[in-house]
Amino acid sequence: MKDKKLQIGIMGSAQDLNYGDALRDLARELGREVARSGNIVVYGAEKDYDSLSTQAARGAKEAGGTTVGVTYGKGKDIWEQEGFTDILIVTGLERGGGREFVLVNSCDAIIAISGGSGTLTEMAIAYQSNIPIVVMSDTGGWAEKLGGTYIDARNRLKAEIAVTPKEAVSKVLELIRQRG
């Protein structure tokens, strides 16, 4: 499966949406960079939030990429925003664990930017599942708190730190390659 497109999850803040233009732009560029690498952006499609993950999906579409939105609830009408989600996976599950489990396990690796409790949950699921994690530095939230660390004493995998979107994508691709 040498030519298989990889599914790169972008996990980021929905929280109170008080992030500034710099984080919004960084998330969009992250999505563009995944698209430029020829891979797929997977993100948590939120009906009621314009999260950093959603910004990454927009960026991917701006660069001609493919996006997969994993949403909560039931029925395809849960997702009303159009134009930047190519494939929608409706889990029938709620936020807070169930939907995040499906989201993360649909990814070959994840990149976290800032992040509240949902991003923390997604990072923990990735860690437990040995799915590579890269975090964007200086973005606040759980990405910054867990960057460069192991989540627990088992030392399964470290949340690697990247400074730029290009570096983040390069790191996830290398981690996936190493993982085999």
Regions found by a protein language model. Give the residues of each.
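Acidic/glycine-enriched connector segments
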Residues: R28, R32, R36-G38, Y43-I125
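C-terminal binding/interaction regions
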Residues: M11-G12, G96-K166
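Short, hydrophobic alpha-helical segments
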Residues: V172-G180
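Alpha-helix N-cap and loop-to-helix initiation/capping positions
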Residues: A22-L26
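Short, charged/polar "capping" segments at the starts of alpha-helices
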Residues: N18, K76-W79, G141-K145
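Accessory recognition modules or surfaces
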Residues: K2-L6, Y19-D21, L52, A60
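Generic N-terminal amphipathic, Lys/Arg-enriched alpha-helix
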Residues: K4-Y19, E33-I40
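Residue-level signal for short, function-critical loop segments
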Residues: A14, A45-K47, T139
